[in-house]
C-alpha cells in the first residue's frame, strides 16, 4: 500500500546519501566565500607591539588578496585573541579558536612559551600552525607536520651574533635572557655557538617574562664588565637593562635577537640606542631593490598604513606564503591539501626575494639571518 510518509522518508534518506560526501568533506573554517584563520598573540602588555605589528603586516597582504576576489573565490579573515604573552591565556584562546570559532588554521602566534603551551592543543586537533613568531628549537624538533616556520631559528640567529663578535676579537661575552622557554632557547643557542669556538659564557642574568625589573640583572652584569651582552628578551626589558647599565657607565656592546622587536626597542631607547645590534630574519624593510620589500612598501603607501618595520614585514611575508599554499591547494580546500601544497614550495619554483622552501620532511622554511645596528634618531643601518 502506498504511504506518503514512507515515500517522503525514503526521499529524504536518498537525498542525505547524495549530500553526505559534501557534508563529510566540508573543512572547518572553509566556506564558499571565506577562509577563517585564528591568531593568539600579545595585543596588550609589555610585548604588545610585537603582536600588533605582525598582525598589521599580515592584514596588509590579505586585504590586497581580498580586494582582488580572494583565493579560489574565498576571502581570508583573521580572528585575533589577546593572550598578553601569557601561556595560560594562549591555551584558552587556542581551544576557543579551534573548538568554538572553527578556524581553518592558526597563524602568527607570538612567542616561545605561548606557542609551546598551544602545541598539544593544535597538534591533537591536527590544525595547521603557520609562521609563529619564535625561533625556538622546541617547535622545530621533533618534526611536527602541523607547524610551518618562515623565520630562521634562534640557533641560526645566535650563531650569527657570536660569529660577528668573534670575528672582531670579542670573546668576553655575557647573556641577558628572559626566565622562560624563550630565554632558555636563546641562551642554549649562544652557548652552542660559543662551544663551537672553544669559548665560554662570561656570565648570564635573567628577567621575568612581562617584567621590566632588571636591577639585579644590571648589577650582576656590571660586576663582570663583559665586552658584549647578547640579549634574549622583549623590547621593554632589553631597553631597561641597556639604559640602567649605560647610566652606570658600562661601555660594552649590546646585541639582540630579532624577537626583541626592533622598532619598539629603538623607540624605547632613544639616544641610548645608538650602536645596539639586532639580528634580523627578514630582509631590510627599506631595501627597495628587494622584490618583496618593494611590494610591501607599495602596499603600505597605497593603504596609508604607516612606516615600514621588521615585524610587519614578517607578517606580510608570512601572509604571502600562506596565500601561496592556498592557491596551490586548489578550490577543494582541506587542511591536508593545504599542508601538502605548502610542501611543494621550493627555491626553484617560488622566488619572492626572500628564501622560503619546504618539503614533506622539513617545515623550517628559512635560515636567513641578517644584522642591523640602531643609529641616531631611532633609525637602522644594514
Where are the model-predicted features located?
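Extracellular/periplasmic Venus flytrap/periplasmic-binding protein
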Residues: 92, 136-138, 145-249, 284-294, ...
